[in-house]
């Protein structure tokens, strides 16, 4: 998603949980 700018870890976790 677009949470990489504010929360890189959140974005990475989101990729694993949601799958992009």
UniProtKB/Swiss-Prot annotation:
Expression tissues: Chorionic epithelium (trophectoderm) and placental cotyledons.
Glycosylated position list: 4, 20
Cellular localisation: Secreted, Extracellular space
One GO process term, biological-process aspect: proteolysis
Keyword set, alphabetical order: Aspartyl protease, Glycoprotein, Hydrolase, Protease, Secreted
Tagged with keyword Nucleotide-binding: no
Principal EC category: hydrolase
Signal peptide as annotated in the record: none
Listed GO MF terms: aspartic-type endopeptidase activity
EC number: 3.4.23.-
GO cellular component: extracellular region
Family the UniProt entry places it in: Belongs to the peptidase A1 family.
Other remarks on this protein: On the 2D-gel the determined pI of this protein is: 6.8, its MW is: 67 kDa.
Protein name, per record: Pregnancy-associated glycoprotein 67A
Species this chain originates from: Bison bonasus (European bison)
Higher taxonomy: Eukaryota, Metazoa, Chordata, Craniata, Vertebrata
